[in-house]
Amino acid sequence: RPRPQQFFGLM
């Protein structure tokens, strides 16, 4: 599953 940092990058 994607990491928290990846989530921020998507935003």
UniProtKB/Swiss-Prot annotation:
Swiss-Prot/TrEMBL keywords: Amidation, Neuropeptide, Neurotransmitter, Secreted
Entry superkingdom: Eukaryota
A cellular component annotation (GO) from this entry: synapse
GO biological process: chemical synaptic transmission; neuropeptide signaling pathway; tachykinin receptor signaling pathway
Function noted in UniProt: Tachykinins are active peptides which excite neurons, evoke behavioral responses, are potent vasodilators and secretagogues, and contract (directly or indirectly) many smooth muscles.
UniProt record similarity statement: Belongs to the tachykinin family.
Protein name as it appears in the record: Substance P
Organism field: Gallus gallus (Chicken)
